[in-house]
């Protein structure tokens, strides 16, 4: 079966896309919980490797402890299967010395090496041209070597030191803000609860004063009504007593008048009767 030119072109495009996709290094999680990006293709000098890491918003790896070194060795074993030429982030600042003890520095941080995993008789600065640090494929123990910075190798990247430091500082600030906000919220809730209790107490006191006031007003009204009733009764009694006394006086006066009239009539009748008798005798 023959292939048309269109089929061939499609296959080539697919192969290019597949190859490009497959060549992109992926983040790998190590035993220390951190993620590293490992490029195994031997086509980058040290500076190119640095730039590649930067393009992924990362940096060439720094190894400051045996624990971190062991985690990276374990990761390389799992990803590559054996020791491999991989650029690290260290260099000797292009020192001309061939002293094995010459200082090396981690470029991402500027810090001098506090830990190293050199292979035997290294770093030797062979021909005064070896200034950059890498894991050496000729050493099965994944030991380090100094080499010409222009040699093509793979590389190992890790999260950017400054961004990681910034993120950590930002995280700490955020945590501090959360704690402060939580404290303020707690204090506000406590103050609000206290004010609510005080308000409830004041409300209860006002209600009690109002109730007591109503009771006192009612007592005063009752006392006033009783006093008025007593006054009215006293006035009525005085009026009755005065009326009774006046009536008795009138009755006594009438009786005296009657008696006086009767006496006068009787006396006048006797006189008239005597006069009549006298008249009868004379006439």
UniProtKB/Swiss-Prot annotation:
Induction, as annotated: By injury of the body wall.
Presence of the UniProt keyword GTP-binding in the record: no
Job description of the protein: Role in the defense system of the organism against microorganisms. This lectin binds galactose.
A GO molecular-function annotation: carbohydrate binding
Pfam families cross-referenced by the UniProt entry: Lectin_C (PF00059)
Domain of life: Eukaryota
Protein name (record): Lectin subunit alpha
Keyword Disulfide bond: yes
Signal peptide: 1-23
Keywords from the named record: Disulfide bond, Lectin, Signal
Domain called C-type lectin: residue spans: 51-159
InterPro entries the record matches: C-type_lectin-like, C-type_lectin-like/link_sf, C-type_lectin/snaclec_domain, C-type_lectin_CS, CTDL_fold
Disulfide linkage: 53-157, 132-149
């Amino acid at each position: 079966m023959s292939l048309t030119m269109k089929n061939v072109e499609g296959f080539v495009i697919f192969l290019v896309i597949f190859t490009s996709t497959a060549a992109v290094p992926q983040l790998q999680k190590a035993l220390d919980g951190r993620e590293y990006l490992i490029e195994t293709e031997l086509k980058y000098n040290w500076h190119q490797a640095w730039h590649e890491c930067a393009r992924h918003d990362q940096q060439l790896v720094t190894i400051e402890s045996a624990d971190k070194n062991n985690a990276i060795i374990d990761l390389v074993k799992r990803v590559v299967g054996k020791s491999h030429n991989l650029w690290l982030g260290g260099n000797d600042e292009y020192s001309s010395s061939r002293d094995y003890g010459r200082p090396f520095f981690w470029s991402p941080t500027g810090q001098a090496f506090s830990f190293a995993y050199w292979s035997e008789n290294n770093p030797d600065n062979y021909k005064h041209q070896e200034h950059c640090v890498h894991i050496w494929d000729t050493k099965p123990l994944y030991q380090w070597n100094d080499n010409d910075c222009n040699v093509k190798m793979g590389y190992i990247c890790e999260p950017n030191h400054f961004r990681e430091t910034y993120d950590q500082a930002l995280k700490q600030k955020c945590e501090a803000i959360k704690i402060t906000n939580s404290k303020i919220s707690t204090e506000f809730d406590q103050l609000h609860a206290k004010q609510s209790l005080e308000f409830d107490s004041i409300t209860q006191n006002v209600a009690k004063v109002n109730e007591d006031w109503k009771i006192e007003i009612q007592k005063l009204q009752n006392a006033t009504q009783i006093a008025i009733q007593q006054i009215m009764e006293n006035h009525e009694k005085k009026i009755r007593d005065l009326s009774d006394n006046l009536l008795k006086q009138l009755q006594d006066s009438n009786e005296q008048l009657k008696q006086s009239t009767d006496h006068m009539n009787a006396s006048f009748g006797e006189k008239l009767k005597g006069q009549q008798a006298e008249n009868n005798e004379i006439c």
